[in-house]
Amino acid sequence: MYHQAIKDDIHDWLGFRGSFYDAYDAGARKMFWRQMDENLYTKYKFGIDAWWMDASEPNVRDCTPMWYRKALSGPTALGTSTEYFNAYSIVNADAIYHGQRSVNPNQRVFLLTRSGFAGEQRYSTATWSGDIATRWEDMRAQMTAGLNYSMAGLPFLGLDQGGFCAENRPLAPPREVLHPGNGQAAPEEAPEP
């Protein structure tokens, strides 16, 4: 576990004091899977078909400068968080993939994760791009990110379509959805306020 967050009394969004585990440590990965297995997977008699791993990067606290995020996320078993920060999701995926296969080698693993890293598909992992604000420019950026992600050789990316309301502003008029072949004329696009 990363200790700086405990020393600084950091609380997660639910209000619990804690930190992230060091996924770069093989023993920590085994412990992480053991907790998932005992409290979820085996407990529900292998009734879990897929995992949705939100927060699969060591984002101990939002809205902090990068130097402080890295201080909260290290040091890792491999070295400084500055050197290994972006690879967290792949070693976290390794823990889940190999953990589930060790318990039930005949069941396919599927993992949806909020953070991606090159090569993660070897662990049956797909990436979800993460939360976005409810603005058209953010949706447009999702399309660009998805194309770039796919061009990097990663086969599957889910884009966030709903987003979070990041600003206090009036809602745009509702947009109509057209269904081809039903004779509806195209409506004017609702302007963004």
Named regions from a protein language model:
Residues 1-193:
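Catalytic-domain carbohydrate-binding cleft regions of carbohydrate-active enzymes
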